[in-house]
A protein has these predicted regions:
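Active-site/acyl-donor-binding loops of N-acyltransferases
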Residues: 72-118, 184-186, 198-221, 232-281
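Acyltransferase donor/substrate-recognition loop-hinge adjacent to the catalytic core
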Residues: 91-159
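Short, solvent-exposed loop/turn segments at secondary-structure junctions
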Residues: 21, 66-68, 253-254
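Transmembrane-helix bundle segments that line or gate the permeation/cavity pathway
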Residues: 52, 56-69
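A short, internal acetyl-CoA/4′-phosphopantetheine-binding micro-motif in the GNAT/acyltransferase core
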Residues: 31-40, 64-69, 215-226
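Conserved acetyl-CoA-binding loop-helix of GNAT-fold acetyltransferases
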Residues: 38-52, 223-240, 263
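A conserved beta-strand-loop-helix scaffold within acyl/acetyltransferase catalytic domains
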Residues: 1-27, 31-34, 137-219
Length: 281
């Protein structure tokens, strides 16, 4: 990945010239955005866009630190509550600077919270063709390798997907390993033991070690129905452990998970946008 860091006294960002495909052509991406003042941000953004044009590219996405495996999205609406663990954050004027330069939303997302005491813990009917189990807490490297392999398959059809090496994925998550709670990580397995789905949830340690909130961060499956069963298992386990609130984190507006969150009583408290700009060619 080609990465350049552009920086002035009042602004900085990273420029990635080997970004994902966007409508049939490679896009650049602008990530790690920090604009201390509107003027400093405007000036640096124009410098970055000129660099993109000089590289022969006609489209750019932002904020995105190279790909969707890394940090991306601006907060576009908020109820003002503090950011949860691993949530993107930005200054209010930063997305406005992008908009003034011609960027428009290309994808929208939200996070919702739900009190766990309203969730029905009654068991679901026995699943057909797979089982759901919590992680046993052993061999986190092996667990992450399985998750990487399934993620690569499950997310390959998503917009703006870019493959990354397994080593890069492991490097991203090795700092998170000490924070993991095995009872909040679930796997769906076929009858032969092959991984068919995973769910990753983590306590919201941004609130401190005694947090009463858990974040349902990511889940994916390769077989119909497994996602529903893993989500149910996560809600039931979080409530049993003593958590009071679950955060349905960073869900694409058009994803099936969005409808599921609403059905379960999730209340949106934050919205996000990924922005894009194309030039006429």
């Amino acid at each position: 990945m080609t990465i350049e860091t552009l920086k002035t006294d009042g602004a900085s960002l990273t420029l990635h010239l080997n970004g994902p495909d966007w409508d049939g052509a490679r896009a650049a991406t602008l990530g790690t955005v920090s604009f201390k003042t509107p003027q400093a941000g405007t000036d640096l953004l124009q410098q970055a866009l000129a660099r993109v044009r000089d590289a022969g590219l006609d489209r750019v996405l932002g904020p995105m630190a190279g790909d969707t495996w890394h940090s991306y999205r601006f907060v576009s609406e908020s109820d003002g509550t503090p950011a949860f663990l691993m949530e993107p954050a930005n200054r209010p004027h930063e997305p406005l600077i992008f908009a003034a330069a011609g960027f428009q939303p290309v994808a929208r997302y939200f996070s919702a919270r739900m009190p766990l005491d309203i969730y029905d813990p009654a068991p679901l009917p026995s699943p057909a063709g797979f089982t759901i189990d919590a992680w046993d807490g052993h061999d986190p490297d092996a667990m992450l390798r399985e998750v990487f392999a399934l993620s690569s398959a499950a997310f390959a059809g998503n917009a703006f997907y870019t493959p990354i090496p397994e080593s890069a994925f492991l490097d991203m998550y090795k700092t998170v390993i000490p924070l993991l709670t095995p009872e909040l990580i679930f796997f769906a397995r076929r009858s032969d033991g092959a991984l068919a789905g995973f769910l990753f949830a983590i306590p919201n340690y941004a609130e401190g070690p005694d947090t009463k909130a858990v974040i349902l961060k990511t889940y994916a499956s390769l077989i119909p129905g497994a996602g529903r069963y893993m989500v149910h298992a996560c809600h039931v386990a979080a409530r049993k452990i003593g958590y009071e609130t679950i955060i349905h984190a960073l869900i694409h507006d058009d994803n099936r998970s969005a409808a599921r969150s609403r059905q379960e009583g999730g209340q949106v408290f934050r919205r996000y946008e990924l922005l894009g700009l194309k030039w006429d060619v």
